[in-house]
């Protein structure tokens, strides 16, 4: 599966030739290198291991340094992904943004913006209680269990708690523009995460 690790720069808009305004997200790519391979004999499946963004030397352990010994001039990477079904690359090769030239749609995976501790109405879209007429609860989630049987609250019951900050994938985003010189990709619509967060862009599955 064709893919790259990139950074979400932000959103803007561009005009198409027919005058229609299209909202786009700008994704910038630092050099992506193949840092290893997985084989059927050793690992049970074949895949390429790609990495991007140099890791600080203070955060590099000896085992990680050993993994990069055979790679000349490539520093240990902060973000690492597996790419299955991608051929024609060897360890040390760079995957450039022009690999998306023939791709019309991509899937983008990122970490959503964390919202902190939120109530049930915001977190799960509950309706809440009556707003007046003597009601003693307005934004409460209501009952969380049953009666004597089962005499407990089931796991996974929707309640207040930490919201968002999860991995999310947006599928079938249209590729609007590829800028090879600036190593940038413009996709139609929004992608998960805050400005400056790192995302994984892959060729669309559908």
From Swiss-Prot:
Pfam families: Ribosomal_L3. Keywords: Ribonucleoprotein, Ribosomal protein, RNA-binding, rRNA-binding. GO terms for biological process: translation. It comes from the Bacteria. The keyword Hydrolase does not apply. Residues 127-151 are annotated as: Disordered. One of its GO terms (cellular component) is cytosolic large ribosomal subunit. GO terms for molecular function: rRNA binding; structural constituent of ribosome. One of the primary rRNA binding proteins, it binds directly near the 3'-end of the 23S rRNA, where it nucleates assembly of the 50S subunit. Part of the 50S ribosomal subunit. Forms a cluster with proteins L14 and L19. Belongs to the universal ribosomal protein uL3 family. This is Large ribosomal subunit protein uL3.
